[in-house]
Amino acid sequence: AECKVTVDSTDQMSFDTKAIEIDKSCKTFTVDLKHSGNLPKNVMGHNWVLTTQADMQPVATDGMAAGIDKNYLKEGDTRIIAHTKIIGAGETDSVTFDVSKLKADGKYMFFCSFPGHIAMMKGTVTLK
């Protein structure tokens, strides 16, 4: 099983995938986030954040107040399973997390916590 995925983000407020499947044989899983757009991170920054489906909106709402220096995520938020930093045009960041943090029957979402982006920039994470 390939225990990693590359996710591209754009100036059109989109990720190039809406669903990520993680093989349960993976001990860790890595997400490489790219930004193929032209706009800087203060204008069109993106990150990749993993939470349960139930926690997604509250985490994003709390994150807005945190500001860009904190990657639009509340510091020490235990609801966040994994996240990258906010990146802009031409930048990349990656995050590796422990697959044991996910339950087989759990509902998980990935999203961008940059203010206003969650409506367009989200998808499911499934343990298979």
From Swiss-Prot:
PROSITE patterns: COPPER_BLUE (PS00196)
Disulphide bond pairs: 3-26
Binding site for Cu cation: 46, 112, 117, 121
Any one Pfam family match given in the protein's UniProt record, by short name: Copper-bind
Stretches assigned to the Plastocyanin-like domain: 1-128
GO terms, molecular function: copper ion binding; electron transfer activity
Keyword match Disulfide bond: yes
Cellular component terms (Gene Ontology): periplasmic space
Domain of life: Bacteria
Name under which the protein is recorded: Azurin
Organism: Pseudomonas fluorescens biotype C
